[in-house]
């Protein structure tokens, strides 16, 4: 009757485990030979769990813009360049970064708006024509400004494209390597003062920039203020004409290689151009620039992977930093244990100090206690009649696995334990302890040493028998000269008298010839 509750608990636990395995088997997905591609896609998209990748793919499949479905053709570079020109035209009049407000523009285009209320529209279906080009209007700060595609002329767009072609003939230098970026002269004094006042605001607004502002570029330039251009060439606007807008940094167009002749023929920047102090050129940067000019043929833009769009939607992959390992000693007096993990330290305190030996044996005649439950379960097998461990050689059964291991050594002849004193070998620890105890008792019992060789014996009679057998010449030497002083043997340092307290018996042959040398 006492064992029925334990049987019921084990049956319920086994049933719960079976139900849990059944539920988990329904959630498993077999990828077959596509496991490597699946894991590679999960790492590229930045997911940490396989379920997150599956949910993302399901959402993409059910949405209208699924990448697996046949969608519209990719945008031509001219369309993206047109969007960049619109954004740059806005940056010439306003230092704030425009953001995507949503659809609602003309012909179903997208509307971009900055914090100051300036807007311009652009759509994937809209393509730049000679009659459409961005032209900012110089309005006071209190009014709302908007740039639309209808307020431009074809001649201005042609000038912008020609200026863009001239500027893209020179490669852009890497970040903080070449000469500092330069700006165009402001169209007026009032506009120049406005740009100087908004320098600090531009740095604060960089964190709020959209994807167009921070997209990858071939020169890997910093997303600084919109007015700063990476091209080292300066140009002065003509009278009565708006300064031309250069190509945007986020355009995925290929950039030609940097040539050494373009670096040598470059004119020094004018005095009126403002340069940021943190990007000032140093001698080390000049050396890097010359090295870059020699290997400029390799500085070409790489094609953008196809999965960049999905990566941009879910954000960059988070890189986890390795946690610092700290040494945490146990604060209980007399312990001295040191751990590198807080979890291990708490486990040690709980089971070694706080709940020390909290698992007691239920047998009234035993009374043993243990720190861990698994040790108690192993101990409970000694009180039961269950013998689950069977020897494969003789079919003998045992209660514990350790007893089976020791018994198996009888069949294999293995004796892994050895005495350090005499080299005695045995199969189990108990036999070695019993053997070493004999060594300790024997050393304590040998109280009578031999004065000639130092060997020890348990009884004085054993010492006398040893002297008569091993040292007979040394025993007969002192008997020849009873009247004179005894002369010691050269091989003995200081022999004691024959009639010592060890109970040695005198020699029975006093007439034996002496072996001492004559003087």
Curated annotation (Swiss-Prot):
SMART domains assigned to the protein according to its UniProt record, in alphabetical order: ZnF_C2H2 (SM00355)
GO cellular component: nucleolus; nucleoplasm
Region Disordered: start-end pairs: 123-314, 469-519
Polar residues: bias regions: 145-155, 277-303, 501-519
Entry keyword annotation includes DNA-binding: yes
Pfam families according to UniProt: zf-C2H2 (PF00096)
GO molecular function terms listed in the Swiss-Prot or TrEMBL record: DNA-binding transcription factor activity; DNA-binding transcription repressor activity, RNA polymerase II-specific; RNA polymerase II cis-regulatory region sequence-specific DNA binding; zinc ion binding
Zinc finger extent (C2H2-type): 328-353, 359-383, 389-411, 417-439, 448-471
PTM annotation (Phosphoserine): residues: 162, 231, 470
Name by which UniProt lists this protein: Zinc finger protein 692
Organism (species): Homo sapiens (Human)
Gene giving rise to this polypeptide: ZNF692
């Amino acid at each position: 009757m006492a064992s029925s509750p334990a049987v019921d608990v084990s049956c319920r636990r086994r049933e719960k485990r079976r139900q849990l395995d059944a539920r988990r088997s329904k959630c498993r997905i077999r990828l077959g030979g596509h496991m490597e591609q699946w894991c590679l896609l999960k790492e590229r998209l930045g997911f940490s769990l396989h379920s997150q990748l599956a949910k993302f793919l399901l959402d993409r499949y059910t949405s209208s813009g699924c990448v697996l479905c046949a969608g519209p053709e990719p945008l031509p570079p001219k369309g993206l360049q047109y969007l960049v020109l619109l954004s740059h035209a806005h940056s010439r009049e306003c230092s704030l970064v425009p953001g995507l407000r949503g659809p609602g523009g003309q012909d179903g285009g997208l509307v971009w708006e900055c914090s100051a209320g300036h807007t311009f529209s652009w759509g994937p279906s809209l393509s730049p024509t000679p009659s459409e080009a961005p032209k900012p209007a110089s309005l006071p700060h209190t009014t709302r400004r908007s740039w639309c595609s209808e307020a431009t002329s074809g001649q201005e767009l042609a000038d912008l494209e020609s200026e863009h072609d001239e500027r893209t003939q020179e490669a852009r230098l890497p970040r903080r390597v070449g000469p500092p970026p330069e700006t165009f002269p402001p169209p007026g004094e009032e506009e120049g003062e406005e740009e100087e006042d908004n320098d600090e605001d531009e740095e604060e607004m960089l964190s709020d920039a959209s994807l167009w502002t921070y997209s990858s570029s071939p020169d890997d330039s910093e997303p600084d203020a919109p007015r700063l251009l990476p091209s080292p060439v300066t140009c002065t606007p003509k009278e009565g004409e708006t300064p031309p807008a250069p190509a945007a940094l986020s355009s995925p167009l290929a950039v030609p290689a940097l040539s050494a002749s373009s670096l040598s023929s470059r004119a020094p920047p004018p005095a009126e151009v403002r340069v940021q102090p943190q990007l000032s050129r140093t001698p080390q940067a000049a050396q890097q620039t010359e090295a870059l000019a020699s290997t400029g043929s390799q500085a070409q833009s790489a094609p953008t992977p196809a999965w960049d769009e999905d990566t941009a939607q879910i954000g960059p992959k988070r890189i986890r930093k390795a946690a610092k390992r700290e040494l945490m000693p146990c604060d209980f007096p007399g312990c001295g244990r040191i751990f590198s993990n807080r979890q291990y330290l708490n486990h040690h305190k709980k089971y070694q100090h706080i709940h020390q030996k909290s698992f007691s044996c239920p047998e009234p005649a035993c009374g043993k206690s243990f720190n861990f439950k698994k040790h108690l379960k192993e101990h409970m097998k000694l009180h039961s009649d269950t013998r689950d461990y069977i020897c494969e050689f003789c079919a003998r059964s045992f209660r514990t696995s350790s007893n089976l291991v020791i018994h198996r050594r009888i069949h294999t002849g293995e004796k892994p334990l050895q005495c350090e004193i005499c080299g005695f070998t045995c199969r189990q620890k108990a036999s070695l302890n019993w053997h070493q105890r004999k060594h300790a008792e024997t050393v304590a019992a040998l109280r009578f040493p031999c004065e000639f060789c130092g060997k020890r014996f348990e009884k004085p009679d054993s010492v006398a028998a040893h002297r008569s057998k091993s040292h007979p010449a040394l025993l007969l030497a002192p008997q020849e000269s009873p009247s004179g002083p005894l002369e010691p043997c050269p091989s003995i340092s200081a022999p004691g008298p024959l009639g010592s307290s060890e109970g040695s018996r005198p020699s029975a042959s006093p007439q034996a010839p002496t072996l001492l040398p004559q003087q």
